[in-house]
Amino acid sequence: MAGLFLCIFLILAAVLFTKKKSTDIFTMAEASKMLAYAATDFKTSETDDTGKYWYSGYVNAVSEAGLLKIKKPEAKVRFKDTYALAKKLEVPETVLAELQNSAKAMTKQEFLDVFMQLLPYMQNGEQVVKMQAGIAGTPATLKQAGEWEAYTTKGTYRFTGIVLDDKIDKTVTIYTCGKEILAVEDTVENLVEYKNIWIKSSTDTTVETNVYGADRIFKIPGLTAPVENVLADLKVENGSVTQINTKTDTITGMVQAVTKDYVEVQGYGKVALDDAFMIYDIYNGFAVKTYQDIIVGYSLQDFIVAEGKICGAVISKPLNVQNIRVILKNTGFKSIFHENVRLTCSKSFMVSTNEQQTRYNAGDVFELTPDNELLLQGRVTVTPDNGGEISILSVMRSQGVPSYEGSIELAAADDGIVIVNDVPVESYLKRVVPSEMPASFAVEALKVQAVCARSYAYKHLENGAYSEYGAHVDDSTMYQVYNNTSEQSSSNEAIQNTRGQILTYNGEVVQTYYYSTSCGVTTDVSIWGSDSSSYPYFVSRFVSRSQKELDLTDEAAFEAFITSKDENDYDAGYALYRWELQADITALSNSFNAKLYEKYLSAPSKILTQQADGSFQSQKITDIGTITSVTVNERAAGGAVKSVTVCGSAATVRIDSESCIRGLFGMTDAEMTTNTGTTKMASLPSTFCIFKPVYEKGSLSGYRIIGGGYGHGIGMSQNAVNEMVKDTMNYQQILQFFYPGTAIEQK
């Protein structure tokens, strides 16, 4: 029996595992690909126009970095080449001593072993991952696959220059960096399990499936029962389907929070996601989604569970917007985390968890601290009786203690308690519109704000930025200011008269950016580094009764524009239509340096330091010394500054961010002259500005920063809207002015 068992085991091993004898040479081209990603600044896009061979970009990157001496890309890699590579990487002597330094050619596996040994010393070494993956298909077998694109059990990857067609329906060991497969080991397991795929339909001999986003038909001789519209695991062995395990157990409920690790479902709490979790949208045709597409506050999908985890989700309902979920920041809008929460209600209210409910009378105070045992039971929900409003006593706003319609949810987080207000969208708008636009403005102007605010809210329902905490937006200027000012009759009238109206472009909801005051012109999204052609409804135009023909990206033209005023500009009568900040060089330098490191930490890719060779790189910077010059590198459409270079006595930095430029040049203690008086601001009102050096006795003594407008300058100027209404424009005309090509849709 023992001999028989051994024989069977050996046969099975031979069937399931095949290994090509690893005597094939490993070429410089193949090695270059791995090193380009792991040890240079190479980017995938560089392969596009670098030559007629797939390896040209990789070879160029590695050669320029001096990592390998490559005469012929097809030449074999020798042990002495990897030894020289190790010395170039400055590995410790102890590591170097373990490497061979011979002219012998390396097999693939020998190179891969050395590569992994040297990986900790490569600049992108932490991004390289070695893992096992099943190969579901390539362009040779999948119509959805693009050039050099492989669908695997670990996701979709590019595999430029690698042969994968013979690995389909097999499990292999791959080396990846980002979304690129760098290499594949020769060892192959002739068995693969495709977990949580979608079976669309079947016949007696086939099943039509969607495997991780790609359609595939598998042959299954003798299928005894039809299988359709179901989640399943499918095993393939030696090229044949050997097993189908369908999954039909489901849970449903409102989604209260979503992360990459779990979904919090009302009534079930936090349920872990399976490692191979998949989500399929079968309502809008058919599409594969990710956990980031799950919308909190709604129940649009059925969750399929097995062994205590969510394996998949099927979206089968449309999003009919009713409520929005808003994180309430603490006093001063400093943080989303609260040290404690005290609240009461104008009517009786219920405090509930998944395990218990407690009723309180109107006026009773409920208090919660992070260590309260209620939070161990999950999310705590506070629900008022009909018509009741919840007052958060532990938070102060401009109006005093704020009160809220809808329900309040309290959730534990590492840094405190998160408060979420689940409220009808139209009720939300009643406390957004007067917080964003003065209620003293004409009702027609408030209608414009109402449509913009509603559109903004609809757009953010699907963005998922706060899904981890179970919300869509927060109540600060990061989104729309909510309930900083109590609701007003004029804004309520505007909201009611535009009820359900949103702004769309080609049927898609528009991200309706707006700001306080223009300088007489708007800009587009290129100021934020976005592609302006993707947002055709954000254009640069003069916010004026008279249009001009000026190229304000030209420095001289913009200076002439910003140092003059035009009474035809709709914002001409407002304080920040024009402004000027004058500062001596010492005060300006001190203020700039005091904020520099904080700004660098918030946007390290946008604050770059000049190197000895003149190039700019992202690196820690805390002080540039005394400012010696400020140079505008680029202006966006309309003249807003996109990039400046600031030279100092100790260092030179380039700032490629509108918000960082505003923050770094603002001076809390310096008076700013405005159109109507003076003020002090921690940030520049906008980057529609020029930097004029001031000299005394031939030496730089300070700067005059002359500018106009308040805000980013994209989309609608709120103050201009009020003036347009005075000119008898209606809200529809105003929306077309600021968002050309859009349409108002009724939801």
Predicted feature residues:
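Short, solvent-exposed alpha-helical surface patches in non-cytosolic proteins
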Residues: 20-43, 51-67, 71-120
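Conserved, single-site charged/polar hotspot
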Residues: 2-22, 40-46, 66-67, 91, ...
